């Protein structure tokens, strides 16, 4: 019982206490071999004055990052993911956002990838509210008319194409049934 409870304690980030997963709480290892979720490490890297050094929140041992290396490039704790029976996803840090591009696997047709983002806070020097000159001004937005290019993109959408194919098949079968009913009625009973 105590061993199982110890494993459950290991399966969560020691900073935010959220359970590890394979998205924004992916366990990343520092040089001291302590694991933290990528969200906590991203927050830590954004507030640290020395951008290339991360101090471990537990033992204070520094982890030196290469020039321009984000915290998402730190090694993933694969042993923890194996314990949780999860496969790692690639999470990237863009500015003050963590981004995850999830591409669902399908055998029959392509699906649009889903992109999940997690905002880590305001940009330094950014404003918290709307700019004062645009807050009082009201701007009327024109009605957008679909262009030739947007319709072309619509036709390239795999879900739309499958829908169009199914509707064409249903319409064809319906017309075939209607004509065959009238044809057999005229041929067999001589109506008309």
UniProtKB/Swiss-Prot annotation:
Protein modification: Autoubiquitinated (in vitro).
Residue ranges annotated as Cytoplasmic topological domain: 1-161
Induction comment from the UniProt entry of this chain: Up-regulated by ER stress in an ERN1-dependent manner.
Chain ranges passing through the membrane: 162-182
Pathway annotation from the record: Protein modification; protein ubiquitination
An example Gene Ontology CC term for this record: lysosomal membrane
Reactions accelerated catalytically: S-ubiquitinyl-[E2 ubiquitin-conjugating enzyme]-L-cysteine + [acceptor protein]-L-lysine = [E2 ubiquitin-conjugating enzyme]-L-cysteine + N(6)-ubiquitinyl-[acceptor protein]-L-lysine
Enzyme Commission numbers on file: 2.3.2.27
Lumenal domain ranges by topology: 183-192
Annotated consequence of substituting residue 28 to R: Loss of autoubiquitination but no effect on ubiquitination of BCL2L1
InterPro entries xrefs: RING_finger_E3_ubiq-ligases, Znf_RING, Znf_RING/FYVE/PHD, Znf_RING_CS
Function noted in UniProt: Acts as an E3 ubiquitin ligase catalyzing the covalent attachment of ubiquitin moieties onto substrate proteins. Triggers apoptosis in response to prolonged ER stress by mediating the polyubiquitination and subsequent proteasomal degradation of BCL2L1. May collaborate with FATE1 to restrain BIK protein levels thus regulating apoptotic signaling.
Protein name per its UniProtKB record: E3 ubiquitin-protein ligase RNF183
Organism, scientific name: Homo sapiens
